[in-house]
Amino acid sequence: MAQGLHLIWVIFCLHLICISSQQETEFIFNGFGQADLYTDGVAKILPNGLLQLTDGSGQKMGHAFFKKPFEFKSPRSFSFSTHFVCALVPKPGFIGGHGIAFVLSASMDLTQADATQFLGLFNISTQGSPSSHLVAVELDTALSAEFDDIDANHVGIDVNSLMSIASTPAAYFSEIDGENKSIKLLSGDPIQVWVDYGGNVLNVTLAPLKIQKPSRPLLSRSINLSETFPDRKFFLGFSGATGTLISYQYILGWSLSRNKVSLQTLDVTKLPRVPRHRAKNKGPSVVLIVLLILLAIIVFLALGAAYVYRRRKYAEIREEWEKEYGPHRFSYKDLYIATNGFNKDGLLGKGGFGKVYKGTLPSKGQIAVKRVSHDAEEGMKQFVAEIVSMGNLKHKNMVPLLGYCRRKGELLLVSEYMPNGSLDQYLFNDEKPPFSWRRRLLIIKDIATALNYMHTGAPQVVLHRDIKASNVMLDTEFNGRLGDFGMARFHDHGKDPATTAAVGTIGYMAPELATVGACTATDVYGFGAFLLEVTCGRRPVEPGLSAERWYIVKWVCECWKMASLLGARDPRMRGEISAEEVEMVLKLGLLCTNGVPDLRPSMEDIVQYLNGSLELPDISPNSPGIGSFTPLIIGSNPPVSPSTKTFYTSSSANDSTFVTHSIIHGDGR
């Protein structure tokens, strides 16, 4: 009898211990005024009970964890439910931010992580490492191409890596409409988030503050947490980070339970208020006003003294025939100011026709200005007419040309600024993350669509004449846009172009250019070289390599002959690769660079090949013209070093002669 009572007493004590342990990891915080949390970085609890992860400064991160670990006795009991309210508030004068994450981590010490796109979770060494023992639900408000983000407003599930195993645009399920409604994370408004785990399934649900928990989760993914946390123990908390993109990141309330049934609901009426940050606007003092008036008088006198000099400095060439192009003409003064005097700090790049600078115009926003040297007055009217016509062409995969300016011996071309630069930076710059095959193929399709429009869809046939990776720009979504139309020429459909100019870049120029001049087939040749360049991750001409690898066309053809065509692809290519697609694009590149112009496909056919609506012709490395690369060199010898070489060319159109000089670099620029 005594032994039975003793056994019952032991079982009762163990039950009390389990209940106590469970209660220690179940809580509700309607504000964090009384919460005992571990914080580091810039994270802190404000006097009103608001948990602030970041304080509006750049390149910072902050963490906040519940101090007691969440433990499970067996994988079957591996479950939890949590509910929190967050707010991401933009900082006045800044764009965006890098978002926050709800974190499950084997350790509370994440101080070795990096801010910015790493969200305070990983650094370049721990990113992707299984030893990180970390799972996160990210609310990401910045598009990071290196992590294959889908957009700049998404929710993702991360396991030891910021390359999410599942992600979707931020939204919540509307019970009234029976569909998902988009929700903006970086709005400054409080957002509810539920994270439920059980049965090896992780569910994430979002909703605005005053809406009850939707019946359908936004994101659901099978995941075995016992594999990530073999010790069956982890800490729960939050992480936030900023970079050059800055926002204020707050947690208003948080509740946690081991199951959904016992999860306590946050009382939204008790949650602390989110501060609204406004730009400081203090009225100027009397002394400051007087000083400003005196300064204005001095400046006015100085401007008056320099007026004549400045008029001469900013003098432009304006002729009668330019009146019809008035809306497309910019003043030199406006462009000079927009580019901060063509400051070298704003230099985006330089090529055969001149340098490109970044600028900002109040009416147009951010722009790119290319300064083209042009001493010849003959043919200028035709050139300007074609530039203006180019600006009238509208296509989603062409960099919009906004207009021009003429001054003395130079022409300035103004286009929209592309924030992600040119494609060649991601192909040949080791400081940039190499693109995946999927992204490369999408960019290839973008440029094919643009060229097809220029050849067949525009009012006149437009020949680009300089298709290469450095002339392919990337917009905010990393879509490919064909740019740099300084060499473009027009002609009517069904007629031959009236040009005999051999302009362009070595390796992209069709062999027949020197004899028959430019036509759509020569553009196709340049596009073929571009296909090989993007897929192989090397320039069409590489004098530094062995002789048999100099010219990409011959080298890819030789790889095909050796039954190793796939081996020609860029070895740095990330992500999953479709061998069938890669081989198709390489073969299409060889078909486009066929030495016989009549055997090259049209851009219309090329678009269908790339979209899979038309099969590639049955060709082999021994087919006529395939791999018969004869580089067009205006001179006596092929390039043997990446030194600068100058070519003088001329073209005629409408009985006018336009003389230019093109500086073509051996490195393909």
From Swiss-Prot:
CDD domains: lectin_legume_LecRK_Arcelin_ConA. It is found in: Cell membrane. The keyword ATP-binding applies. The active site is at D466. It catalyses: L-seryl-[protein] + ATP = O-phospho-L-seryl-[protein] + ADP + H(+); L-threonyl-[protein] + ATP = O-phospho-L-threonyl-[protein] + ADP + H(+). One of its GO terms (cellular component) is plasma membrane. Residues 307-669 are cytoplasmic. It is an enzyme of class 2 (transferase). The chain crosses the membrane at residues 286-306. It is a single-pass type I membrane protein. Pfam families: Lectin_legB (PF00139), Pkinase (PF00069). Residues 23-285 are extracellular. Residues 342-614 form the Protein kinase domain. Glycans are attached at N123, N180, N203, N224. Residues 24-257 are annotated as: Legume-lectin like. GO terms for molecular function: ATP binding; carbohydrate binding; protein serine kinase activity; protein serine/threonine kinase activity. Keywords: ATP-binding, Cell membrane, Glycoprotein, Kinase, Lectin, Membrane, Nucleotide-binding, Receptor, Serine/threonine-protein kinase, Signal, Transferase, Transmembrane, Transmembrane helix. ATP binds at L348, G349, K350, G351, G352, F353, G354, K355, V356, K370. Residues 1-22 form the signal peptide. Its EC number is 2.7.11.1. In the C-terminal section; belongs to the protein kinase superfamily. Ser/Thr protein kinase family. In the N-terminal section; belongs to the leguminous lectin family. This is Probable L-type lectin-domain containing receptor kinase I.6. The lineage of its organism: Eukaryota, Viridiplantae, Streptophyta, Embryophyta, Tracheophyta.
